[in-house]
Amino acid sequence: MLEAGTVLHNKYTVKKLIGKGAMGNVYLVETLIDRKQLVVKELNFSVESRVSGDSAKEIFFREAEFMARFEHPGLPKMHGIFSHDGHDYITMDYVKGSTLEDIINKSKEPVPLKKALQWAIEIADILNYLHNSFEMPLIYKDLKPSNIMITPQKKVMIIDFGICRYYNPDKDTDTFRLGSPGYAAPEQYKGRG
């Protein structure tokens, strides 16, 4: 784990750890030149298993490839990839706000219907973009409240593209057992669909 104050790639100062996932750690960093806040995702080399024939490193760099193509206000922009001291990193926009999970858990009342519908429409718009803006549909496979950010302007952004992939019409099934229990489709866990 990186300590606050660590300088990466002679460009970024680590401010703090802001997330941990199966594929890696996520840090808030600041650029040395203009003090802009960004996020750096570090590949976790303790991920030993191979998933669907792809190594953790292949999945990690595929995430960067997907993000480099995004041109939607509801998706963070990827700024680059780099290696530092034997570790691989993706640099992307820092999305300010709260996760939908945090909003739900901290609220004593249900999210108002009008607000929930607006967020649902924005999520559908982002998913429509992913499915229809590339040569093959991009399947976002980890939609859950902790991967949905609500910005201070009350706009939706989707984060964490580690298990996205292009739809392959030549395969009988297009899923593998990655995702979050309780949010992935049941057929995904059964190895179907």
Region roles according to the model:
Residues 25:
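Conserved N-lobe ATP-binding subsite of Hanks-type protein kinase domains
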Residues 30-38:
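Conserved N-lobe loop of protein kinases adjacent to the ATP-binding glycine-rich P-loop
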Residues 47-69:
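AlphaC helix of the eukaryotic protein kinase fold
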Residues 81:
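Activation-segment/catalytic-loop signature of the eukaryotic protein kinase fold
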Residues 85-99:
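Conserved short submotifs of the Hanks-type protein kinase catalytic core
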Residues 119-120:
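Activation segment signature within eukaryotic-like protein kinase domains
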Residues 124-138:
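Protein kinase catalytic-loop region centered on the HRD/HxD motif
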Residues 174-187:
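Conserved activation segment of eukaryotic-like protein kinases, specifically the C-terminal portion
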